[in-house]
Curated annotation (Swiss-Prot):
Name used for this protein in its record: Apical junction component 1 homolog
This protein's UniProt keywords: Cell junction, Cell membrane, Cell projection, Membrane, Methylation, Phosphoprotein
Region (Disordered): 21-49, 61-136, 220-242, 264-294, 412-443, 539-574, 614-660, 855-888
Matching InterPro entries: Apical_junction
Modified residues (Phosphoserine): S52, S129, S468, S509, S512
Modified residues (Asymmetric dimethylarginine): R749
GO cellular component, one term: adherens junction
Comp. bias intervals (Low complexity): 616-625, 633-655
């Protein structure tokens, strides 16, 4: 906003260091009781003054020349005063608020002195000048008379200066003052009255000659040029504009001891003992002096500048005399002051002396104006405060706001506006029967919850008590966001610790909890949190599950869990599980689509999935603790649990299955039962269907019985046998090698395809060789393979990748395809339903690299016997290891070093004892733990680096092997 009328820079008090003479003739001032006259030119100010346009010419006008003595305190009724019209009309500022022609005077208005000289001869104007006094003089006593363009930021950095109190150095009152008394820091969490809460939405009222103002009446909605104040800041620890701006002008000070929120029941008879207020004030001088309209507020005037610090160790004292009242119907900026995150005094608050230290300017015994508070605030934050105010669904006069006890000050009954602003989505889902309980009680997880939800908290911004949504939404509004998805910040990710049941449920819809805003990028969008669950507990049982969940309320909102009383150490885990369930459900603020959006399918909404999952609690107390053992859904074709005809597609294990469910090994000779949690981690499945086994050994043992029912597994086994037969059979190997070699030389890299119309034809090939082939092998280059990529799908991509990597001079690619055909079981086996296959294609395909056959067909095959030059590795404890036979920790440590050395030597060659030689591994573990000796053991592993087997002798309990260089034949040459 720009000013249309240039300010008078020479007389403006913003330029404090320029000393100029006041324009116009200077008249004599009335002598004060101190009998010292004021100097001719004004003293420089060392504090910047924030003044509205109504206050620009107040200090340099003729009204400041002579000020009579203030009237007695009894004359609190405002005196009517008319203004003469100005001969010269000034240009009006576009940013100044336009006062309506009539305003209702406040009942507590200060006396106003008439103008003198030329000012008294001016004619009355239709509207007040924005640079002079308003039409109604009582408005000059407003504590928030400050234009938004002159707002000065008072917070936001470590260099913030505490506001100062500009004293009123006028003539002393007739009675001698009781002495300077230090201020008491007024820091009080209190709920403001209804008039304060509705102040931001009320406009200017018409001014009339009525003596009393009728407060309880609906106010029309005006839209002025002033910044709207916040309306929902009552529950925060931070003093809010509503706390600071109340109907009682003396409420900015605290005369007595500071009470807590629970002390109000005892202080109902003392309505003015501890009024609420901010912690710091900033005063500017006023061109007129008058006494306050409340005569019951004693206290001397001030005559010095001093900072108002935050620490509460200052002594109590009488409050200063506050002059003027408030007009609750005026739309103006609100006083806002927030405390810093830490004290300015550090560890020793009393080391800085008295709070009313030395004066910054030499004081003169001249008539000063009444001290008047002005509050400064960054007006860019008003928008976010207004948005936070619109997130609370209850009116300010409802019982939801009455959780701080009775109000210890006078209130004004103000009717709430008839058309409130639309409600925004917030983090307190409280439109149900009970109001949100964000700050009423504290739970043991709320502290970490605030830290989780506050993204990057700044040190100078104190967190509200239990109001994580306010900190989150406040920063969301504060940070501008682009329309493109790249410009948006990703949603908050919360890491929790829970059971696999909840982990699986939230994993079902990992993208459903994202930012789902309305059509625009305005402030009405809804933020959703993406939970990321980490599994840590796997021993949950049905008896430990919470018996009831109170997360379902009218409107689909969630509410915090009730506070569980500590009833013993045995129920600690039960309470933690209940709170964990409620905490997860609280993440979903409202999973329903907003108005105007198409409703999502029920399967895509996380809300119904969470409801179905978390409400699946066990039956009554008579039900068994564990669910009956059942086979996994994958083994739907087993004899113990036959599958229904339509369950083939749904036979995969449920990711949201309960952790108390059990899974049984499909091997009939094992039937091992494990919990669903352990089964998901350790169980192995068939490669062709969803049949699970507890280990690979059980899968191999059950293959003969399983392949009778698993059609795809049986056909896949045929493919593997064909590939092995092509390697082992000499005539087949030479024939296929010749075809592949000629195809590569003529058409480049490619694949040799061998197809069978049925598993029976493949069996004939295995029995009769080349004479049993029904289809001749075909060589396709990679370019030709690309033309058939559509029907092959991912298998074609795998073939192309392997075709670019193989070495044509040494091997070729052989692909075997077998059509599944009718799923007939082998003869002699009972007809059982087939388990659910992993793929439903009509053909099973497998490929492998096959080495090219030798050029001479008469060349004998190489002998398969073990070579005499096989490498031998002898493993003993490392050199320097001693004390293997000792008992205690020293001996155990020595044996552990020997064990680590043996494993390291084998792992360098790609051998893992635990998997390949588990018996030897168990012997070594017993040797380390219990010093149980065993005889030297010989194993024949394969070196993964060379592919050749070697002999390894493990002698863990023998003496350490001598150093290799000591046994060297050229030891002397190496030393010399």
């Amino acid at each position: 906003m720009t000013r249309t009328d240039p300010p008078d820079l020479l007389v403006s008090t913003v330029y404090q260091d320029i000393k100029v003479a006041t324009p116009g003739p200077a008249s004599k001032c009335s002598p004060c009781e101190r009998s010292v006259a004021r100097p001719a030119e004004p003293a420089p100010f060392n504090k910047r003054h924030c003044r509205s346009f109504d206050f620009l010419e107040a200090l340099d006008g003729p009204a400041m020349e002579t000020l009579p003595e203030p009237p007695p305190p009894e004359s609190a009724v405002p005196r009517a005063r008319t203004r003469e019209a100005e001969p010269r009309r000034r240009a009006r500022s576009k940013s100044a608020p336009r006062a309506p022609p009539g305003l209702t005077p406040a009942p507590a208005s200060p006396p106003v002195l008439p103008r003198r000289g030329r000012e008294a001869q001016r004619a009355a104007r239709a509207e007040a000048s924005p640079r002079r006094e308003p039409a109604y003089p009582a408005l000059r006593a407003l504590a928030n008379e400050l234009h938004p363009i002159k707002l000065q930021p008072q917070r936001g950095g470590p260099g913030r200066v505490a506001p100062l109190c500009a004293a009123a150095g006028r003539c002393a009152p007739p009675e001698p003052p009781a002495g300077p008394a230090p201020h008491v820091r007024c820091r009080l969490d209190i709920k403001p009255d209804d008039a304060v809460l509705q102040h931001a939405t009320r406009g200017s009222r018409s001014c009339g000659p009525t003596e009393a103002a009728h407060w309880a009446r609906p106010a029309p909605q005006f839209h002025g040029l002033t910044v709207p104040g916040p309306r929902h800041m009552a529950l925060s620890r931070t003093p809010t504009p509503s706390d600071s701006y109340c109907a009682d002008p003396r409420a900015f000070y605290c005369d007595g001891p500071l009470p807590g929120p629970r002390d109000y029941a005892e202080r109902r008879s003392l309505p003015f003992t501890t009024p609420p207020g901010p912690t710091q004030f900033f005063y500017t001088e006023e061109p007129q002096g008058f006494r306050g309209s409340f005569a019951a507020s004693p206290g001397p005037t001030f005559d010095a500048y001093y900072p108002r610090p935050y620490p509460s160790e200052e002594l109590s004292g009488p409050s200063p005399r506050r002059m003027g009242g408030y007009y609750a119907g005026e739309v103006r900026t609100f006083p806002i002051q927030e405390p810093p995150s830490r004290s300015y005094y550090g560890e020793a608050p009393r080391a800085y002396g008295l709070p009313y230290g030395p004066r910054y300017v030499p004081e003169e015994p001249r008539a000063h104006s009444t001290a008047r508070p002005f509050y400064t605030e960054d007006f860019g934050r008003y928008r976010e405060r207004d948005v936070l105010a619109r997130t609370y669904p209850h009116p300010r006069s409802s019982p939801a706001w009455a959780d701080w006890g009775p109000r210890p000050y006078r209130t004004l009954q103000v009717v709430p506006p008839s058309d409130p602003d639309p409600l925004l989505a917030s983090w307190h889902g409280g439109t149900g029967t009970s109001p949100p309980r964000l700050a009423t009680d504290s739970r043991h997880y709320s502290r970490s919850w605030d830290n989780i939800l506050a993204p990057g908290p700044r040190r100078e911004d104190p967190l509200g008590r239990g109001r994580s949504y306010e900190n989150l939404l406040g920063r969301e509004v504060r940070e501008p966001r682009g329309v493109s998805p790249e410009g948006r910040r990703p949603p908050v990710v919360v890491n929790l610790s829970t059971s696999p049941r909840r982990y699986a449920a939230l994993s079902l819809s990992e993208t459903s909890l994202t930012e789902k805003g309305r059509a625009g990028e305005g402030l009405g969008r809804n933020w959703y949190v993406t939970p990321e669950i980490t599994i840590t507990d796997n021993d949950l049982r049905a008896t430990e599950r919470p018996s009831a969940r109170a997360w379902e309320l009218p409107g689909g909102r969630t509410r915090p869990p009730p506070h569980a009383a500590p009833d013993g150490p045995t129920s600690g885990r039960q309470r933690s599980l209940e709170q964990l369930d409620e905490l997860i459900t609280d993440l979903v603020i409202d999973s329903r689509p907003t108005a105007g959006q198409a409703s999502e399918p029920a399967a895509d909404c996380l809300g119904p999935q969470l409801r179905r999952l978390l409400d699946s609690r066990p039956a009554g107390s008579g039900a068994p603790a564990l669910a009956p053992p059942r086979s996994p859904p994958a083994s739907a074709g087993s004899a113990e649990e036959p599958a229904a005809p339509g369950e083939a597609a749904d036979a995969s294990p449920e990711p949201s299955a309960d952790e108390d469910d059990l899974m049984t090994c499909s091997n009939a000779r094992c039937r091992r039962t494990e919990t669903m949690f352990n089964a998901c981690l350790y169980f192995k499945s068939c490669h062709s269907c969803y049949t699970y086994y507890c280990s690979r050994l059980c899968r191999r043992e059950d293959w003969d019985a399983h392949k009778a029912r698993c059609v795809y597994g049986r056909v896949g086994s045929v493919c593997r046998h064909v590939l092995q037969f092509c390697r082992d059979s000499g005539p087949v190997h030479r024939a296929f090698s010749r075809i592949a070699r000629v195809g590569f030389l003529s058409r480049g890299r490619g694949v040799l395809f061998l197809g069978f119309p049925s598993p029976g034809s493949a069996d004939n090939f295995l029995r009769f060789g080349l004479e049993g082939l029904l289809l001749s092998p075909t060589y396709l280059s990679l370019r030709e393979l690309a033309t058939h990529a559509a029907p092959l799908g991912s298998y074609a991509r795998e073939l192309a990748a392997a075709g670019r990597l193989y070495e044509p001079a040494e091997c070729f690619l052989l692909s075997v395809s077998v059509a599944v055909g009718p799923g007939t079981a082998p003869p002699g086996t009972p007809a059982l339903p087939a388990p659910a296959p992993r793929s439903h294609g009509p053909t099973v395909r497998k490929f492998a690299k096959v080495a090219l056959a030798a050029g001479s067909p008469a060349r004998p095959p190489p002998a398969r016997s073990r070579e005499p030059d096989m490498e031998t590795l002898i493993l003993t404890p490392p050199p320097g290891t001693a004390g293997l036979d000792q008992d205690g920790e020293a001996g155990r440590r020595a044996r552990e070093v020997a064990f680590i050395h043996i494993q390291r030597e084998l792992r360098l060659r790609g051998v893992f004892l635990r998997h390949e030689f588990p018996r030897v591994y168990e012997q070594l573990c017993e040797f380390v733990e219990a010093n149980r000796r065993f005889t030297p053991t010989t194993i024949y592993p394969t070196d993964r680096r060379t592919g050749r087997p070697f002999m390894c002798m493990i002698m863990a309990a023998s003496e350490p092997r001598a150093l290799d260089w000591v046994a060297s034949a050229n030891l002397l040459d190496d030393i010399m």
